[in-house]
C-alpha cells in the first residue's frame, strides 16, 4: 500500500482541513466521532450553527472529484451519526446544524469547502 496507511493519510488530510476551517473562523469541537452508524471526521461551530464535516481527498480528478465520493449511503450514515452527537449534547432540537464537505485535491494545494453539501431530504 505504500509508506503510509490509509488511516495515516486520512489523518493528515483531516488535520489540513481542520487547520483550514480554523483559519476561516470556525471553532473546533470534535474529531473522528464514531458511533455504530459511522464516523464524522470533524465537528465545528460557526456562529450558532454546528457544522459536521466530511473530509475527502483525491490525488486527481480522473475518476471524479473528491466531493463526488460522498455517496447516498455515506450521507445517511453521516446524518444518523450527527443525530447521535446532537442528542448527546442535548441540543438536537434547539440548534441549527449543517453538513459540509472539504474536498482536497493536488496533495493539499487545492482545498474546496462546500457548505450545506449534504441535505437530510
From Swiss-Prot:
Gene3D superfamilies in UniProt: 3.40.1350.10
A GO molecular function assigned to this protein is: nucleic acid binding
Taken from the record, one Pfam family name reads UPF0102
Q: Which InterPro entries match?
A: Restrct_endonuc-II-like, tRNA_endonuc-like_dom_sf, UPF0102_YraN-like
**What's this protein's family per the entry?**
Belongs to the UPF0102 family.
This one is known as UPF0102 protein VP0448
